[in-house]
């Protein structure tokens, strides 16, 4: 059994601000079409939302879009932290630590009031599992890594979905 990861960063204006194709056009419509197809065929999917400098100031808009419009049951919020190869400084797309923290707090406050047990957000579920002494499925909270195999669209295979880059191929 597989869980398909769909990369989408929120509603159209937030997603298309950072996710464009080779022609510079936003990919929102294609992603939504793919989601419709997955739902039609009852394929389980997980939202992979990169939190960046653009959508990082809109936690409730992003979360409510996934919950209410996409009807996502599983969501991951992954911070964008990119460094310029020459200078080593963070790129303008990177989310600041403060911005990412406020984003997670905004989502958590909404989630804990309304959606615990119906919407699964990886960081929050992992924290709760740890608190209860239960097993969790995220390697950054585990003694070892490699329990979540990833197959990318181009066929590349990784042993962890948190280290999907050439150094870990």
For the regions a language model picked out, list residue spans one by one.
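Radical SAM/AdoMet-radical enzyme domain recognition
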Residues: 1-80
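A C-terminal junction/extension of Radical SAM enzymes
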Residues: 86-167
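Active-site-proximal loop/short-helix segments
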Residues: 81-85
């Amino acid at each position: 059994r597989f869980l398909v990861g769909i990369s989408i960063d929120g509603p159209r204006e937030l997603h298309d601000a950072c996710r464009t194709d080779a022609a510079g056009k936003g990919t929102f419509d294609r992603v939504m079409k793919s989601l419709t197809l997955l739902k039609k065929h009852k394929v389980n999917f997980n939202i992979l939302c990169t939190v960046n400098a653009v959508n990082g100031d809109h936690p409730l808009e992003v979360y409510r879009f996934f919950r209410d419009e996409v009807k996502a049951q599983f969501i991951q919020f992954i911070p964008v932290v990119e460094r310029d190869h020459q200078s080593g400084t963070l790129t303008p797309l990177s989310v600041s630590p403060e911005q990412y923290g406020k984003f997670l707090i905004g989502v958590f406050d909404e989630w804990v009031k309304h959606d615990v047990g119906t919407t699964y957000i990886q960081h929050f579920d992992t924290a709760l599992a740890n608190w209860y002494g239960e097993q969790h499925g995220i390697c950054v909270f585990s003694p070892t890594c490699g329990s979540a195999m990833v197959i990318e669209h181009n066929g590349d295979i990784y042993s962890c979905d948190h280290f999907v880059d050439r150094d870990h191929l």
